């Protein structure tokens, strides 16, 4: 059996439904050789999972997924930080700011959904998930109120409401610099979702991002059609960018429907670990942060 990995998952600390322990246990059940917990705008899930993964013998790659903006590009981009020191003071400070910013943007989105005839509030989303009032929390608040039949119906509504929401406060260049300062690598998540004139990003787009310090792209993703995967894998090779992959598992509406469904070879981990080792030669996985005190 070829060892496989998953470098993109979510827990209850963002839009996921599983605890860090549950997602780690499922990774072990699947026989994964490495896992990254990459919650939106915060690393609570990854930090909580460090000790659990170490005790249970799983390589846990420290991770986070920032919502960022890129000047000249309309819409929000998701930027993965992998291998970084999640206890870094700069990371912790920006986490707090980014979480506040995101909740304000979700409240704005709820306002637009209300205008569209789906009366929803950020407080109702908090009632679903007090840790992170995100897209899935809003969707299930709508289901609970009988506004929609299921959470998947909300996907269409978001395509109408979310583009009206102001951009994320965190600039991609600053986020890349932050990740590097914490000893990690910066990877654009699911690049096939970002378009210019309805076309995939080109070599020029990735060259511009690499000039800002981008380290890699997520060319393996469960929603990525094979032609797009080939496109981005080719661009990554031409640009000397790392290739990563993940299921983007959230656990909604129930269970782990995506982890392990599409094997992601762990050979992709080699380049990532080599890059992190160059940035943080004194560190090795799994990182021991037990001396840093309780999570806050």
Question: At which residue positions do the language-model features occur?
Answer:
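Extended substrate/RNA-proximal surfaces in nucleic-acid metabolism proteins
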Residues: 52-208, 267-287, 294-296
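Low-complexity, compositionally biased segments
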Residues: 9, 18, 44, 81, ...
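An N-terminally biased module of ancient metal coordination in phosphate/nucleic-acid-related enzymes
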Residues: 1-76, 156-159, 164, 170-171, ...
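C-terminal appended segment following the main domain
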Residues: 222-296
């Amino acid at each position: 059996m070829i060892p496989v990995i998953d470098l993109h998952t979510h827990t209850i600390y963002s839009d996921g439904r599983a605890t860090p322990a549950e997602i780690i246990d499922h990774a072990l059940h699947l026989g994964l050789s490495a896992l990254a917990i990459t919650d939106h705008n915060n690393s609570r899930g990854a930090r909580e999972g460090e000790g659990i993964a170490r005790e249970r013998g799983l390589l846990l790659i420290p991770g986070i997924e920032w919502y960022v903006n890129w000047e000249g590009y309309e819409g929000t981009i998701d930027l993965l930080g992998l291998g970084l020191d999640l206890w870094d003071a700069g990371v912790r400070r920006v986490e707090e700011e980014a979480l506040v910013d995101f909740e304000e943007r979700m409240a704005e989105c709820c306002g637009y959904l209300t205008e569209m005839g789906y009366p929803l509030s950020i407080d109702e989303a908090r009632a679903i998930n007090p840790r992170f009032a995100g897209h899935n929390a809003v969707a299930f608040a709508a289901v609970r109120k009988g506004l929609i039949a299921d959470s998947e119906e909300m996907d269409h509504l978001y395509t109408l409401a979310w583009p009206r929401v102001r951009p994320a406060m965190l600039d991609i260049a600053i986020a890349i610099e932050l990740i590097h300062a914490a000893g990690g690598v910066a990877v654009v998540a699911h690049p096939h979702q970002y378009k210019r004139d309805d076309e995939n990003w080109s070599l020029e787009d990735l060259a511009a991002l690499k000039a800002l310090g981008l380290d890699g792209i997520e060319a393996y993703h469960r929603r990525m059609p094979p032609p797009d995967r080939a496109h981005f894998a080719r661009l990554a090779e031409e640009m000397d960018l790392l290739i990563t992959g993940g299921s983007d598992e959230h656990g909604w509406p129930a269970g782990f429907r995506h982890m392990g469904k599409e094997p992601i070879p762990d050979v992709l981990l080699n380049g990532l670990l080599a890059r992190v080792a160059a940035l943080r030669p004194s560190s090795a996985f799994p990182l021991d942060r037990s001396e840093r005190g309780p999570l806050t």
